[in-house]
Amino acid sequence: MNPAHLLVLSAVCVSLLGAAIVPPQPLNLIQFSSLIQCANGGSRATWHYADYGCYCGKGGGGTPVDELDRCCQTHDNCYGEAEKLTKCSPYYKTYKYDCSEGKLTCNDAPGSCERSVCDCDRVAAICFAGAPYNDKNFMINTETNCQ
């Protein structure tokens, strides 16, 4: 075998091995982002909510800093309830929904994991759209501000 071909083949194999150990990314974050954009009419990019206050983004704790942060706390708690359903992983569960003129509708069967997760995201998206956004609460130091 040609050494150049062997080198390319080795690189591909190593790449595939590396990809096999990369954990899957939460699929429904894309859907949640779409629901947020539907509810707020695209007025604020969804990444603004990824690291806001004490609860928006990964994890959460302490006292919410404002109304928007309370929306995130409620969303976290809602996902916690959804996780109690059999085989329900909210961060990886996708669902069916419609967005029409800012109105969000979840279309999966009531009581299903998919519907529960969609309802969590729908309520949060509507809450985000109605809550004031305070720039000073974006990327705060959670260790000192979230007691």
UniProtKB/Swiss-Prot annotation:
Disulfide bonds join C38-C99, C54-C146, C56-C72, C71-C127, C78-C120, C88-C113, C106-C118. Residues 1-19 form the signal peptide. Residues 20-27 form a propeptide. Keywords: Calcium, Disulfide bond, Hydrolase, Lipid degradation, Lipid metabolism, Metal-binding, Secreted, Signal. InterPro entries: PLipase_A2, PLipase_A2_Asp_AS, PLipase_A2_dom, PLipase_A2_dom_sf, PLipase_A2_His_AS. Pfam families: Phospholip_A2_1 (PF00068). One of its GO terms (cellular component) is extracellular region. One of its GO terms (molecular function) is signaling receptor binding. The active site is at H75, D121. It catalyses: a 1,2-diacyl-sn-glycero-3-phosphocholine + H2O = a 1-acyl-sn-glycero-3-phosphocholine + a fatty acid + H(+). Expressed by the venom gland. It comes from the Eukaryota. Its EC number is 3.1.1.4. It is an enzyme of class 3 (hydrolase). Its cofactor is Ca(2+). GO terms for biological process: arachidonate secretion; fatty acid biosynthetic process; lipid catabolic process; phospholipid metabolic process; positive regulation of fibroblast proliferation. Binds 1 Ca(2+) ion. Ca(2+) binds at Y55, G57, G59, D76. It is found in: Secreted. PLA2 catalyzes the calcium-dependent hydrolysis of the 2-acyl groups in 3-sn-phosphoglycerides. Belongs to the phospholipase A2 family. Group I subfamily. D49 sub-subfamily. This is Acidic phospholipase A2 2. It comes from Bungarus flaviceps flaviceps (Red-headed krait).
